């Protein structure tokens, strides 16, 4: 919609409103002056005021209709722009929208979880071996005795 069209509509509405005000004021003035309702001047003023009132109502309806259409057009334009933005994001991330992507993502996540589980199992084996001593219990006791003996000797040397 051109700005000049909007301005022209506003001017016509304002002119109709001013005409109505002038003729209505003249009609009321004649009534207060006790003019006869058949007086040609009263009839002209009254008929002009009624016509101006219809013009104001018509211009208001037209302005409301145009504004409503413009609002709808702006809403649709915003929706189309939003769709274009969404399309741009989806185009940049096409791989995420493939039909098999969700399955591939789940499979990759499962594979990672399985790898982590295997790593945890391997780390647990290492902890068992490193922290729990040698697999043979007799060898463990001998190692403990040797360690205790070493500590006693070290303490005796210091004294």
Swiss-Prot record:
Specify the signal sequence span. Answer: none
Highest rank taxon of the organism: Viruses
Q: Which UniProt keywords apply?
A: Host cytoplasm, Host nucleus, Virion, Virion tegument
What Gene Ontology cellular component terms go with this record? Answer: host cell cytoplasm; host cell nucleus; viral tegument
The ranges of region (Disordered) come to 123-145
Can you say where in the cell this protein is located? Virion tegument; Host cytoplasm; Host nucleus
Family according to the record? Belongs to the alphaherpesvirinae HHV-1 UL14 protein family.
Relate the protein's function as given in its record: Contributes to the nuclear transport of the viral transcriptional activator VP16 during the early phase of infection. Therefore, participates indirectly in the regulation of the immediate-early gene expression. Additionally, seems to be important for efficient nuclear targeting of capsids.
Name recorded for this polypeptide? Tegument protein UL14
């Amino acid at each position: 919609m051109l700005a000049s069209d909007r301005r022209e509509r506003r001017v016509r509405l304002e002119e109709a409103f001013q005409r109505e005000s002038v003729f209505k004021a003249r009609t009321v003035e004649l009534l207060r002056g006790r003019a006869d309702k058949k007086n040609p001047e009263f009839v002209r003023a009254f008929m002009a005021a009624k016509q101006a009132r219809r013009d104001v109502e018509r211009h208001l309806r037209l302005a409301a209709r145009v504004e409503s259409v413009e609002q709808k057009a702006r809403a649709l334009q915003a929706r189309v722009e939003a769709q274009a933005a969404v399309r741009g994001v989806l185009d940049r991330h096409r791989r995420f929208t493939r039909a098999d992507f969700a399955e591939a993502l789940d499979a990759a996540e499962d594979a990672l979880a399985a790898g982590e589980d295997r790593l945890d199992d391997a780390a647990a084996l290492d902890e068992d071996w490193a922290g729990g001593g040698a697999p043979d219990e007799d060898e463990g006791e001998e190692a403990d005795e040797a360690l205790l003996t070493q500590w006693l000797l070290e303490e005796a040397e210091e004294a």
